[in-house]
């Protein structure tokens, strides 16, 4: 941010995360629910860093009259994601596990947790369009949510990816692993009022991401 300020960048977007919201937050999550409860312990350090970024944006706006903004996207996925099973998020991890299982003719796929938590996913191309819209139409010190407004269980997601990838074996749930936050779905009224809405369905996104992974990994 200091470097951008030094060269007089007029429009700057801080890309935050839905992790800024409390673990047991009312659903759907409105922007004003920030700092109203305890964060999810497993990623609190990451969330605190994002919260600090939001405050920095507010400070630059106040002190230097910068037209800088903060956006909070939900879980993202798509081409060029991190598919490393040791460090990836749930969506790319499931893409890799099921496509690799089909390649290797494996009969089972193990997935962490119980499959019960509910999550919301947004394709990165839809995020790009939302960011461009915000650069043009949004100018506020308050952050803005970007998501789809709909969610599903991790179990439902796993079954969709299994079906689209062609996996016909058994899904084994490892309940010894943490489920994390029970539910995350964003209230996206602010951004829909600006004229934006997601255009890529989950099924379309899964299919195109699998195709990208198979061609590039």
Task: Name each region found by the language model.
Residues 6, 11, 19-77, 81-87:
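Catalytic helix-loop patch of NAD(P)-dependent Rossmann-fold dehydrogenases
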Residues 100-217:
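C-terminal substrate-binding subdomain of Rossmann-fold SDR/epimerase-dehydratase oxidoreductases
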Residues 16-17, 72-73, 148, 187:
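A secondary-structure boundary/capping signal
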């Amino acid at each position: 941010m200091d470097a951008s300020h030094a060269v007089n960048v007029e429009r700057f977007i801080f890309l935050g995360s839905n992790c800024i919201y409390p673990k047991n937050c009312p659903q759907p999550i409105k922007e004003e629910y920030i700092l109203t409860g305890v964060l999810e312990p497993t990623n609190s350090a990451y969330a605190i860093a994002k919260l600090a970024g939001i405050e920095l944006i507010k400070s630059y706006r106040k002190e230097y009259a910068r037209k800088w903004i903060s956006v909070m996207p939900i879980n993202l996925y798509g081409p060029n994601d991190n598919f490393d099973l040791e460090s990836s998020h749930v969506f790319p991890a499931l893409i890799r596990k099921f496509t690799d299982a089909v390649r290797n003719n494996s009969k089972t796929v193990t997935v962490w947790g119980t499959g019960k938590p509910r999550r919301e996913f947004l394709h990165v191309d839809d995020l790009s369009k939302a960011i461009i819209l915000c650069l043009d139409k949004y100018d506020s010190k308050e952050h803005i949510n970007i998501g789809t407004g709909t969610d599903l269980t991790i179990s439902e997601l796993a079954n969709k990816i299994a079906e689209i990838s062609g996996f016909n074996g058994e899904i084994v749930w490892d309940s010894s692993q943490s489920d994390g936050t029970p539910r995350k779905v964003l209230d996206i009224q602010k951004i829909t009022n600006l004229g934006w809405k997601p255009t890529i369905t989950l099924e379309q996104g899964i299919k195109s991401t699998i195709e990208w992974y198979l061609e590039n990994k």
